[in-house]
Amino acid sequence: MTATLAERIATVRARGGATMADLSADAVIGEDSVSYPLAQTPARQWRCDSDGVGIAVYEWGDETAPPLFLMHGGFDFARTFDVFAPLLAAGGWRVVSWDHRNHGDSDAAPFTSWSADIRDAVNVITSVTNVPSPIVGHSKGGAMALRLGQALPHKFTHLVNIDGLPSKRAAPDVSNHERTRLLQKDLSGWLDHKRASPEGQRKPGTLPELASRRARMNPRLSPQWLSYLVTVGAKHEADGWRWKIDPMMRMGGFGPWRPSWSLDGLPGLPMPFLGLLGLELEQMGWGTVPDDLRGFLPRHGHLETFTGVGHFIHAERPVETANVVLEFVS
């Protein structure tokens, strides 16, 4: 008798392997560098011209292997997958990820929105292949993957959403143009924030200081991992380290977007769908709980929950998460 997807996922989770705690115990933090177990620099880096905006693209794995696309969340960058992506690549995939515009090493564009990010994603994907491929997204990247799956279902064989599942609540890491209601105080607050950063760059600090700032939003992630992220997601200048994130971006925003729109479209996904949900709520998470999704999963959909894990499932339990994803897309 053929095992169900849920049964097969339970089997691979049982051999989950290393957790963040295991890996962090063996990390080595220097003054300006960090060695983190299993982290791998991308095998290839290139740029995609997305209608005049340069998008930094990163790849792990054999260039001749079938592609698997990986999308990061808001206030993040592709190198946050330096542990997770190589694990997927070891499963026989050419893993392709990229920095969203105004994130990481992609160009800082004067205009940014989820619609612009979607266009950039399509440009990257079509630059790599015209063959249908799996797509995996975390947080905002997961929500973007849902939109791509709804708009271009012929391009994707499987869709995995890592803790970016919609509910009736507003998402915390959307950009400033994507708010539930256009309120005067929100608009005024955004303009005040813009005026307060005339130099157009983020506050500098030491490597430990930047890791500590990130820990305020990601309290479940280890200091060792956050320190590693500084070395791959910040630039080191004469006055210290600065995150390579648009200084105009901040939590929240304003505009017409409503989270229920994504939720209402979820049942219509035609490809096999896997949702991964961490049950420990935290600031960067979406606050979605399993009951929010009851009746909304697509016909070929499966929801897998992780007890004792927060928003960054693939960082807290990278080996287990990679095993579950590889089992699903295979």
Task: State what each model feature region is.
Residues 1-68, 90-93, 129-131, 166, ...:
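Alpha/beta-hydrolase fold catalytic core
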Residues 53, 90, 100-136, 140, ...:
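Active-site loop/oxyanion-hole signature of alpha/beta-hydrolase fold enzymes
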Residues 58-105:
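Conserved HGGG/HGGXW glycine-rich cap/lid loop of the alpha/beta-hydrolase fold
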Residues 150, 157-203:
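Flexible "cap/lid" loop of the alpha/beta hydrolase fold
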Residues 200-281:
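Alpha/beta-hydrolase
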Residues 267-309:
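Conserved loop-alpha-helix segment in the C-terminal half of the alpha/beta-hydrolase fold
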Residues 306-318:
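Catalytic histidine-centered segment of alpha/beta-hydrolase-like enzymes
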Residues 315-327:
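Post-His helix in hydrolase/transferase enzymes
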